[in-house]
Amino acid sequence: MRLNTLSPAEGAKHAPKRVGRGIGSGLGKTAGRGHKGQNSRSGGGVRRGFEGGQMPLYRRLPKFGFTSRKAMITAEVRLSELALVEGDVIDLNTLKAANVVGTQIEFAKVMLSGEITRAVTLRGLRVTKGARAAIEAAGGKIEE
């Protein structure tokens, strides 16, 4: 077997539809596009969201909201992900080193999701009430 002898299984590939190749093909002359009109022309058709000149939905509805720039540099960390970090003291840099959060992250908050079994010290991270209770129950502590 060589690369130049490989071919798809019989019946696995369908031949493309050949249009505009005579009356007998069933798709000659207008090639299945009908007569006249915008969609029959080369490059015809209307853009996405166009409603024939009527004020389109995306312009009829009001604008709202924005994208918080702080949300882009903030991460949520689960309790179970703290197990991936080596060492007893966990801060933002150790989370980045363990690939728990991305390098562009500047703020992190620890959430109560999963379990923590070892005692760790969190430094400079925000913590939810539930996560704080779980960390302290495991013998850890939180430093601001």
UniProtKB/Swiss-Prot annotation:
Belongs to the universal ribosomal protein uL15 family. This is Large ribosomal subunit protein uL15. It comes from Yersinia enterocolitica serotype O:8 / biotype 1B (strain NCTC 13174 / 8081). Residues 1-52 are annotated as: Disordered. Residues 21-31 have a biased composition (Gly residues). GO terms for cellular component: cytosolic large ribosomal subunit. GO terms for molecular function: rRNA binding; structural constituent of ribosome. Keywords: Ribonucleoprotein, Ribosomal protein, RNA-binding, rRNA-binding. PANTHER family: 50S RIBOSOMAL PROTEIN L15, LARGE RIBOSOMAL SUBUNIT PROTEIN UL15M. InterPro entries: Ribosomal_uL15, Ribosomal_uL15/eL18, Ribosomal_uL15/eL18_sf, Ribosomal_uL15_bac-type, Ribosomal_uL15_CS. Binds to the 23S rRNA. Part of the 50S ribosomal subunit. Transmembrane segments: none annotated. It comes from the Bacteria. NCBIfam families: rplO_bact. GO terms for biological process: translation.
